[in-house]
Amino acid sequence: VSNEDITLTAGDAEVTVTPGNGGRIGSLRIGDVELLRQGHKFGCFPMVPWCGRIRDGRFLDGATLQQMPLNAPPHAIHGTARDGAWRTARTGKSEAVITYDLVAPWPHPGRVTQLFTLTEDAFTVTMSVETYEDSFPAQVGWHPWFNRNLGQGDVQVDFTPAWQEERGEDHLPTGHRIEPKPSPWDDCFGMPDGVDVTLTWPGQLELKVASREQWVVVYDEQEAAVCVEPQTGPPNGLNTRPRLVTPIDPVEATMTWSWRRL
């Protein structure tokens, strides 16, 4: 069993996957241009078994109130798998599969799998959560940090959400849906026809983030990077919109990045 870095190539595209650093995508290079912010905490990390913040780190699991560590006090953020070591199940020139077994502090055993597939103009990731025992609520999503500037001007973010989740003082959705507001964002949006966000680096590259999932968090309040995060439910969704993983029904999502030079 190995968790050494994996390099995938197709055409002039190259992806590095880092199983040993939380199962994150460490690099996406197109030609000689790096699209992801570099650094141990950056790249693109998996959010699982929840996305964004859980209010006070607590969620109802059947009749049991579960408490997660408050890693973003007073809340718990972005799941546990990004802090663990994943294992490589298989790898080839342009495809790889890695897995992670859920352990404490998450209260239930389960397995998370990510499948990565690279072509010369697209990169697709599928993530699933399976249980062999108890059913439990879970979410999956991804948190990429795209470099704001690739050398020729700041990225433009274009998308047409149906609504924005109103954000409360505690940083969590209030439950009200509002008209989408202009940037700056650290906000969750509803896209009922599927996530479809276009990033344009003027004169260089256009990249589309697409998913059949209906929720996306967009975060552009940092100077170095912009985050476009497809996910299976909104922040605090383990409480507000719980979706169960059962022995016959995994939670699964797919995200595709596709690009073209300008």
Language model feature labels by segment:
Residues T9-G11, G31-V33, G62-T64, T119, ...:
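Short strand-coil-strand connectors
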Residues P69-E120:
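Extended, loop-rich substrate-binding clefts of extracytoplasmic carbohydrate-active enzymes
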Residues S135-P137, P144-R212:
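Active-site/ligand-binding surface loops and adjacent short beta/alpha elements
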Residues L8, V15, P19, Y100-N149:
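Acidic, contiguous internal or C-terminal segments within carbohydrate-active enzymes
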